[in-house]
């Protein structure tokens, strides 16, 4: 009580109200109390609420601004972290959902949140919300791994005025968004984002809601998804509203004459290396936004004696008006000269002459006159030896280096729509029936047989294979000079010839960039080994995988060169295995596969050549293949992080590490006392400078690790940290080493080892004010000469390794209050 009165007295000195009362809280006027409460931090209010029960309603009547409220956890343990505007932290943990929800009811009642972050798993949370009669005031809300019913329940309790809503739908394959779109906050929010969405129809449904309610200009919706066909589906739904369209964006009109809706397909640094994720942005914009319009896209596909001319409307390109104008002019000049000199071609002319003359005159007139052509107009000109089943190809700017991107359409037939095709150069397997690309119309994908395993298309929308013997250099958007080849015309010898030609070209380009001399303009097999090694050393992982397949005779040479990665991630989720590697702050490799054998082969190769700064392994079953344990390969990494791995996978991976690992982090929810003893026999654990276990469930870890250090005479500065969901670890450590104690306090104990130069120091990470359901400890090997005055009493920095969110808000923040110390009145209404 005296400490609380002291805090209140300090607050009084800052008040502008007179007189200043030097008396008990209960004797103060209500207006003074209200002024005091309004200036208190949340921690002070929680303390005052427990000591002044008679006037709890007065304390609760004052709102408080909270910068962030983070609620996360599983049913067995919940954590709530609150950060005030000034950076003060309240961090609480609960094993009881009832206690957690009572605390949240109070926080939601008095708090005005800048950001509300929710990650809860369990039906009990939804059931509690249904009985909550209050409302939540928040500017932005982030839902992480929450199901649809829980999201709807939370949003139903939110006050008007929310500006941003973010949802991670990784578990939301059941999201239909139909119920979510009925909520007024979602309809009127300025910014809405869904990540990892796994269903169709979301884009046009959001746009339709905006049209129906006449949403404000600037309203934005963003989506990341692996689902194919959303862009095409959007076009089909709003075909009568299209204002303009390009390969990556479409603009539609709304019922309001001053407003349009713009849909964009976007890419970033992550998507630069794979096509499975697509990013969309939907925006409500003013209809007066300036945009260069070109009402037609012309493309010329020219062979030796065949010319195809196609005008495709209503496709519009937003740039290059003058370039298109020039291409139109030059195209018709060449075409006119050919037709004048070849009278025989007139009988092959498949178009009305006045249409052709109109297009020819268009070159010198205003290009906007093409709008007068009835849509859709297709003008086909076949010369004498023109092949049948020719496709229209509109080259576009490729998103990634080394790839080609087109809009493709079959001439004639029922389907003359344009479809997006991506030609991948990294795949060298041509054993399938089509090119290795994916279809933007139906999303058809297939796997090839090479190790890279890029994807391909074999569907009704694509009618040809784009292969080449020479270079393919498109001029801006419009003109492509190439030789279209059907795969049925290519025998196995021709395939091998194309592969060899591609390998030589790629090798030559790599050699040109190397510093070695001389530069060889020759086949790969004719190059000296030192040049090959120089080339391989400059290759990224995808290039090496391709070279491994094409140069099997020298695979050992390719595999002899190490490749360094800043970070590597192995993820096993359900039946999927994913690999993601980055270097120089850039993702350089991403792959997902459902085949456990293929995942094992790739992991085996990565163990052989990869050198990681930081290696992370997520989820369960990564090491469940018997061959993983039988394989001789070892991971090379400085830092290892095992996240939510089952205990068998954890032990298997630890046994497959090289000895120079510097840091190991793991979860302890499946580590039993017996498994911990097995882990302590692994040499990497015995010699690693730092390792920690998060959420261990037993009390024997501290003395077992210390005993292992004593037996192995571990080096000074060896460090072990652990969070324990059980009481008694500190006492058990003291009991085990009672004959070795050098010094002891409530939070620290120091023991001697068998080496007179070394002691072991145990520290409790949270002081006596903070009593939460789990305890954090640090164990260190220290010099026997270290004085107690040299101890680091600030625990926040090293606790940051166990719980980064605590350090995230403010380095001066303190930890406050436990649910047992916070009293609630029975039947209180929040």
Curated annotation (Swiss-Prot):
Q: Could you say what the effect of mutating residue 49 to W is?
A: In v35; transforms XX hermaphrodites to females
Output the superkingdom of the source species: Eukaryota
Signal sequence, start to end: none
User: What are the BP-aspect GO terms?
Assistant: cell differentiation; sex differentiation
**Pfam family of the protein (one):** F-box
Following inactivation of the gene, the phenotype reported is: Temperature-sensitive phenotype in which XX animals are self-sterile, do not produce spermatocytes, but ovulate and produce progeny when mated with males; XO animals develop as males, but some switch to oogenesis in later life. Animals do not produce fog-3 proteins responsible for controlling germ cell fate. RNAi-mediated knock-down results in 95% female progeny.
Quick check: keyword Repeat in the entry? yes
- Which UniProt keywords are present, listed alphabetically? Developmental protein, Differentiation, Repeat, Sexual differentiation
Q: Which SMART domains match?
A: FBOX
Please list the residue ranges annotated as the F-box domain.
24-69, 523-563
Query: What role does this protein play?
Result: Sex-determining factor which regulates hermaphrodite development.
User: What name does the UniProt record give this protein?
Assistant: F-box protein she-1
Lineage of the species this protein comes from: Eukaryota, Metazoa, Ecdysozoa, Nematoda, Chromadorea
